[in-house]
């Protein structure tokens, strides 16, 4: 362990915080000018280690604070950081931070940043090796000089101090002080014993006269006890009689009171039932009026339906005759259309075949005429040209023109083909559309029937929902037991009335409950419930009374035990309680006591386990989640059958005990009880409030359900009505769509016919274009062949022959074409006639007849007699149901009225019984008051008798039996005689015996105490002897060690010399003989008390010459001897580190080197740390680390410097 670092602030010359760089664990040297702050640095360390500056006054503390320019320093501190790697400090940490802080009014220590006392710091330092008896690990300026100038006697005192004799002296002084106190006590005891012996002699003479007085007094007390005891027994007997009468009367009164309370409850129930029946009667009257209104409306609707049914029946015959005529016309037109379509179907294939043959003949004719025309053109053309060149030129021009024409024709051909494709696509779309319209018109009757069925189904669904909206099954809950159909809206109106009544009951129950607590608590509980709803707090459970149930037998006991705790609010955690309390405080909404479950702590109790006790908590039914709250309130209470048993268990087990009636005994012995009015029960009030709240919430929830059901029914009805309207609209569209459909079909047919005609025209045009294109291509081929042939003015023979053949073929082809064209024209004419007849005559006629058929069917559907008959049956059934319901309502009203009459009679009888019970209770109450007055007077007499008996004091045994059978008059006479005899002893000291006994006991006690003091004095004498012996041994042992170390160290410092310590005794003063105790084998023949001093004898030049006393040496030699003595003391009692302040100031150069080398040797060999200040260079040469102190602007600072800088500074100081 060593000093690792020092931090100074505000101490003497160190104003600002000065953090000194860590010290070396070996040898550290500090240099600086005089007045720079070196000594203040050492003073700071001594300030912390308490070597000095122990008991500081205000002025002394002020002197330690820095004084300089600027703001005044109000506090200062010095902090030393020790390296504790060797764990000499028992802290378990590698470092120890010790700080001392002072101010004008404070002086405190801290260990590792924690406050500590001065004793703690001193004990810790001593445990690490800082000896209180050896302060020489710190050597300030002047201490070496003081050792040099010490007298031999002072040096002996120093040796004793190092040996630790101060401890022995302190314990010896304490022992002597105790011995002095013991002697003083012994003297006082002797004085008291003398006084007691004198007083006992006086009391011995008074005992005989006192003995006679006591005999007469004993007789008096026996007689008085007999009289008082008999009077006490008479009073007790009379009190028992009164108590028996009271108990019997109380039981009768309790029975009558219970009957009275039960009668009041029954009357309240009857009144509630009467009110409910009357309310039911009002509801039934409303039902009856509404049912009669519905019956009138249903009868009116039935009459209208019957009238409509008759009208439909009259119109049905005329409709059937018109339909027969229409059916005949429709059949004739359909037959004609079928004939025409059959003929057209046979004609169309023949027409197509004839047309194909005509097209083939025309193609052959066109081809032959084209070839003949080319040959004629060639024949006439060749005559125009002179040579082949002209011909070829013309041919090439023609080929070019024809190719251009071919391109143009091909373009027209492509466009025509596209037009044909478009028309075919249109036809492909029109044909299925036309077919669909035809099928739609043909199937229109089925569609109308299907739509009619859907419309009827929608009507049935609408009527069913309307009935469901009007009527529901709802059981009656009060007087009547019948179940009748109620209307939802009517039930909703009833629930509104019930809700208002329930809300009023809740308000009444809340007012009743609030009267049982203070106003602020009532407001607070209401506010907590509101806050819970508004903020949706889950951990707020409710008041304690709301969280449990109990049997009525134990209700009074539970209320008495809980008291106002019934209204404490149970929450899950204190955080929840804090949150609610903050809101309550902000709103100023009353006061509430919370019970946070996480903060409640219950201790296990020794509950009695017996047949006549029951733990109260076992009689409560509650959720185990609230166990802590109920244990906190009820866990320490038991239920006992009576107050006597309760008192016994309360005293023996330290619990609270109560009876079922509410009488209570707590563990401190207090008894409470009396009458409890069960009609003012807080638990009943809480239960009543909870009941009406549940009723209110139930009815409110039912009202919400009804409204929701009504809304759902309204939505279903709206949806059904919408669906019905949609279907009726669809039916109307179907009924009215006959004309538009047929018009659309005609339009589609016309368009389709037009497109077919266009298609035929386009196809004919396409064939013509293809023929023209083929002719142009043949022409180009012929021109190209002619271009490659030789030039001739006339046709060749082959061409002439071909021309002749073509002329004959063209005539034949033309005749064939004309025959085929005639056949095709004939067939086409017939086909056109049939198509026009169908399109212009028969199909329109058919459409007209079908439209008329649909109209007839529509007219028949609108007056559907079946639908009217179904509506007639439905209305008849509704009237029957209404009649049945009216009969049930009448019956229910009659039953409700009978029940009201019956309950009213019962209520009147109960009221008469209650009046009689009240009179009986009042009469007994008056009797009880008289009995209580008698009991009070007798109890007072009994108390006086008991007080008189207690005044008699301790009675002899014969007092209880001696006059047991003696007549009371005789006892009174004897008492009179005894009192007369006692008058003669009025002057007697009645406390002589008591005083004699007290003085005897005191004498024995004092004698025993004196013997103890004698033994204590012997023990103290023995202790003083032992302490003296140990002190002598410690001094002799210390001298031997210091003497041996002094000789060794002196020899190291002065190798050529020799030094030793010499003990001086009283017997040596005349002879001046020296007694060298250096030899360890020599026995001590003289007591330490004979020691008068310690001398130093040294020789600096020889080990054998005569030695000199220290007084004979020079100043430097004296300082060296003093240092050798310091080193010897330190060697005997090593410290963790050493502080030397300019110890080499007065040494010669050669000895300074030796001292410096000694410090280095000790540091290396013992791992001791040295922190030294010096003005000499010798220590700097062996130092491991050098520091320089400077003084600037009236403040000191200390920094690390190199050895060279330190040496330079020392040299400058010399110059």
Curated annotation (Swiss-Prot):
Record-annotated SMC hinge domain positions: 538-650
InterPro entries: P-loop_NTPase (IPR027417), RecF/RecN/SMC_N (IPR003395), SMC (IPR024704), SMC3_ABC_euk (IPR041741), SMC_hinge (IPR010935), SMC_hinge_sf (IPR036277)
Keywords linked to the UniProt accession: ATP-binding, Cell cycle, Cell division, Coiled coil, Mitosis, Nucleotide-binding, Nucleus
Principal subcellular localisation of the protein: nucleus
Gene Ontology CC: mitotic cohesin complex; nucleus
GO molecular function list: ATP binding; ATP hydrolysis activity; double-stranded DNA binding
Region (Disordered): 313-332, 654-676
Compartment list: Nucleus
Function of the protein: Involved in chromosome segregation in mitosis.
Protein name: Chromosome segregation protein sudA
UniProt organism field: Emericella nidulans (strain FGSC A4 / ATCC 38163 / CBS 112.46 / NRRL 194 / M139)
Gene: sudA
């Amino acid at each position: 362990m060593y000093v690792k670092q020092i931090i100074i602030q505000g101490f003497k010359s160190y104003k600002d915080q000065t953090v000194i760089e860590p010290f070396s664990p070996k040898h550290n040297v500090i240099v600086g000018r005089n007045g720079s702050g070196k000594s203040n640095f050492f003073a700071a360390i001594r300030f912390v280690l308490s070597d000095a500056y122990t008991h500081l006054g205000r002025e002394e503390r002020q002197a330690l604070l820095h004084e300089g320019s600027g703001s005044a320093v109000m506090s200062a501190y010095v902090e030393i950081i020790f390296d504790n790697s060797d764990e000499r400090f028992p802290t378990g940490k590698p470092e120890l931070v010790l700080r001392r802080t002072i101010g004008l009014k404070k002086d405190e220590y801290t260990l590792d940043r924690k406050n500590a006392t001065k004793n703690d710091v001193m004990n810790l330092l001593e445990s690490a090796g800082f000896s209180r008896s050896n302060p020489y690990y710190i050597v300030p300026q002047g201490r070496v000089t003081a050792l040099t100038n010490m007298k031999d006697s002072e040096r002996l005192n120093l040796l004793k101090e190092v040996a630790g004799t101060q401890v022995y002296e302190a314990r010896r002084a304490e022992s002597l002080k105790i011995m002095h106190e013991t002697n003083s006590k012994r003297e006082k005891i002797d004085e008291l014993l003398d006084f007691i012996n004198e007083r006992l002699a006086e009391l011995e003479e008074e005992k005989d006269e006192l003995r006679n007085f006591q005999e007469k007094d004993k007789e008096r007390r026996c007689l008085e006890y007999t009289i008082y005891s008999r009077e006490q027994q008479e009073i007790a007997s009379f009190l028992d009689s009164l108590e028996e009468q009271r108990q019997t009367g109380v039981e009768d009164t309790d029975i009558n009171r219970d009957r009275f309370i039960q009668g009041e409850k029954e009357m309240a129930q009857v009144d509630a039932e009467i009110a409910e029946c009357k309310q039911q009667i009002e509801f039934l009257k409303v039902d009856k009026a509404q049912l009669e209104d519905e019956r009138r409306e249903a009868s009116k609707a039935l009459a209208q339906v019957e009238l409509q049914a008759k009208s439909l029946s009259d119109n049905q015959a005329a409709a059937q005759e018109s339909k027969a005529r229409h059916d005949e016309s429709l059949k004739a037109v359909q037959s004609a259309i079928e004939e025409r379509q059959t003929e057209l179907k046979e004609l169309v294939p023949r027409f197509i075949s004839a047309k194909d043959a005509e097209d083939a003949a025309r193609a052959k004719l066109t081809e032959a005429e084209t070839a003949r025309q080319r040959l004629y053109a060639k024949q006439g053309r060749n005559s125009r040209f002179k040579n082949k060149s002209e011909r070829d030129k013309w041919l090439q021009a023609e080929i070019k023109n024809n190719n251009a024409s071919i391109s143009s024709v091909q373009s027209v051909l492509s466009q025509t083909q596209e037009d044909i494709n478009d028309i075919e696509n249109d036809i492909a779309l029109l044909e299925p559309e036309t077919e669909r319209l035809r099928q739609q018109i043909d199937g229109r009757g089925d569609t109308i029937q299907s739509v009619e069925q859907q419309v009827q189904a929608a009507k049935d669904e609408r009527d069913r929902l309307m009935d469901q909206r009007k009527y529901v099954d709802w059981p009656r809950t009060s007087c009547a037991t019948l179940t009748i159909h109620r209307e939802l809206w009517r039930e909703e109106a009833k629930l509104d009335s019930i809700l208002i009544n329930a809300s009023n009951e809740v308000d009444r129950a809340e007012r009743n409950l609030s009267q049982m607590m203070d106003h602020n608590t009532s407001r607070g509980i209401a506010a907590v419930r509101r806050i819970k709803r508004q903020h949706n707090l889950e951990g707020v459970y409710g008041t304690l009374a709301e969280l449990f149930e109990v049997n009525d037998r134990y209700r009074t006991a539970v209320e008495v035990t809980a008291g106002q705790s019934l209204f404490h609010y149970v929450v899950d955690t204190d955080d929840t309680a804090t949150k609610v309390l903050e809101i309550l405080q902000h709103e100023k909404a009353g006061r509430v006591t919370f019970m946070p479950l996480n903060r409640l702590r219950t201790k296990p109790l020794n509950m009695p386990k017996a047949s006549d006790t029951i733990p109260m908590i076992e009689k409560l039914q509650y959720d185990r989640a609230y166990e802590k709250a109920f244990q906190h309130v009820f866990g320490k209470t038991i239920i006992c059958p009576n107050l006597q048993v309760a008192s016994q268990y309360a005293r023996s087990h330290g619990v609270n005990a109560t009876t079922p009636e509410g009488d209570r005994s707590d563990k401190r012995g207090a008894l409470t009880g009396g009458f409890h009015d069960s009609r003012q029960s807080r638990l009943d009030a809480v239960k009543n409030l909870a009941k009406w709240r549940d009723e209110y919430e139930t009815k409110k929830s039912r009202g919400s359900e009804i409204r929701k059901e009504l809304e759902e029914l309204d939505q279903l009805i709206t949806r059904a009505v919408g669906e019905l309207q949609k279907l009726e609209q669809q039916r109307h569209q179907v009924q009215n769509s006959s004309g538009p459909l047929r018009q659309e079909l005609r339009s589609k047919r016309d368009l389709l016919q037009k497109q077919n005609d266009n298609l035929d025209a386009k196809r004919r045009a396409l064939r013509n274009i293809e023929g023209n294109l083929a002719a142009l291509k043949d022409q180009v081929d012929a021109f190209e062949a002619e271009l490659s042939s030789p030039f001739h003015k006339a046709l060749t023979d082959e061409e002439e022959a071909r021309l002749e053949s073509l002329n004959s073929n063209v005539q034949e082809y033309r005749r064939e074409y004309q025959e085929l064209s005639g056949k095709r024209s004939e067939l086409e004419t017939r086909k056109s006639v049939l198509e026009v007849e169908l399109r212009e005559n028969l199909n329109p006629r058919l459409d007209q007849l079908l439209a008329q058929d649909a109209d007839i069917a529509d007219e028949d559907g609108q007056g559907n007699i079946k639908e009217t008959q179904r509506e007639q049956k439905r209305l008849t059934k509704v009237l029957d149901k209404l009649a049945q319901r009216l009969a049930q309502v009448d019956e229910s009203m009659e039953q409700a009225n009978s029940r009201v009459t019956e309950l009213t009679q019962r209520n009147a009888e109960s009221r008469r019984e209650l009046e009689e019970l009240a009179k009986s209770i009042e009469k007994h109450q008056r009797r009880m008051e008289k009995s209580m007055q008698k009991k009070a007077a007798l109890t007072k007499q009994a108390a006086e008798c008991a007080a008189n008996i207690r005044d008699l004091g301790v009675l002899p045994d014969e007092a209880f039996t001696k006059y047991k059978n003696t007549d009371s008059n005789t006892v009174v006479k004897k008492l009179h005689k005894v009192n007369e005899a006692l008058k003669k002893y009025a002057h007697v000291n009645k406390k002589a015996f008591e005083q004699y006994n007290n003085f005897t006991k005191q004498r024995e006690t004092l004698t025993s105490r004196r013997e103890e003091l004698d033994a204590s004095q012997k023990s103290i004498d023995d202790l003083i002897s032992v302490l003296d012996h140990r002190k002598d041994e410690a001094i002799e042992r210390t001298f031997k060690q210091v003497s041996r170390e002094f000789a060794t160290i002196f020899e190291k410092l002065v190798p050529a010399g020799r030094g030793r310590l010499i003990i001086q005794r009283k017997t040596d003063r005349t002879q001046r003989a020296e007694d060298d105790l250096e030899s360890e084998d020599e026995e001590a023949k003289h007591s330490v008390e004979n020691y008068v001093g310690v001398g130093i004898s040294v020789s600096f030049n020889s080990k054998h010459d005569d030695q000199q006393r220290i007084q004979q040496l020079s100043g430097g030699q004296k300082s060296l001897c003093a240092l050798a003595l310091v080193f010897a003391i330190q060697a005997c009692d090593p410290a963790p580190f050493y502080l030397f302040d300019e110890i080499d100031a007065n040494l010669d150069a050669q000895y300074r080197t030796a001292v410096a080398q000694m410090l280095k040797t000790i540091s290396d060999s013992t791992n001791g740390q040295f922190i030294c200040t010096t003005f000499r260079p010798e220590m700097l040469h062996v130092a491991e680390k050098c520091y320089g102190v400077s003084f600037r602007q009236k403040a000191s600072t200390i920094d690390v410097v190199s050895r060279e800088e330190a040496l330079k500074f020392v040299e400058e100081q010399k110059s």
